[in-house]
A protein has these predicted regions:
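Buried hydrophobic-core signal for structured, non-transmembrane domains
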Residues: 47-49
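C-terminal boundary/linker segments immediately following FHA domains
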Residues: 15, 54-56, 63, 71-107
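Short polybasic amphipathic segments
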Residues: 1, 66-70
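Membrane-targeting and insertion segments and their boundary/processing signals
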Residues: 21, 61-62, 68
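Intrinsically disordered, low-complexity acidic Ser/Thr-rich regulatory segments
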Residues: 1-40, 89, 100-107
Length: 107
């Protein structure tokens, strides 16, 4: 999101206004990435980005109150169903609401 430094992903990351590193049951503690939410429209633990093996990554909405959108690099926009993983591709943008956009870049 605007003003945030890039974060190198090596394991699970939880995105939210006050994320819980242990929200993913049965998985090791995750890195947390706090995002601004002045209107509290972004859930505390809103979404997770997780490795899926062989360099691929997945996005999961963690049952957030207002949902998560995935804006694909090809122009498609999709609602991410709660607790369902969807593939992330280079250039995709995770839309958490309140104009908080997280760009996924593969290097």
């Amino acid at each position: 999101y605007a003003g945030a430094a890039p974060v190198e992903l090596t394991h699970n990351v939880i995105l939210g206004r006050d994320p819980n590193a242990r929200v993913l049951t049965g998985r090791p503690a995750a890195t947390v990435m706090r995002v601004p939410s002045p209107a509290n429209e972004i859930s505390r633990s809103h979404a997770a980005v997780m490795p899926s093996g062989f360099g691929s990554w997945m996005l999961m909405d963690l049952g957030s109150a207002n949902g998560t959108l995935l804006r694909s690099s090809n122009g498609n926009v999709q609602d991410v169903p709660p607790r369902v993983t969807v593939a992330l591709n280079d250039g995709d943008v995770i839309d958490l609401g309140e104009n908080v956009l997280v760009e996924f870049i593969v290097r």
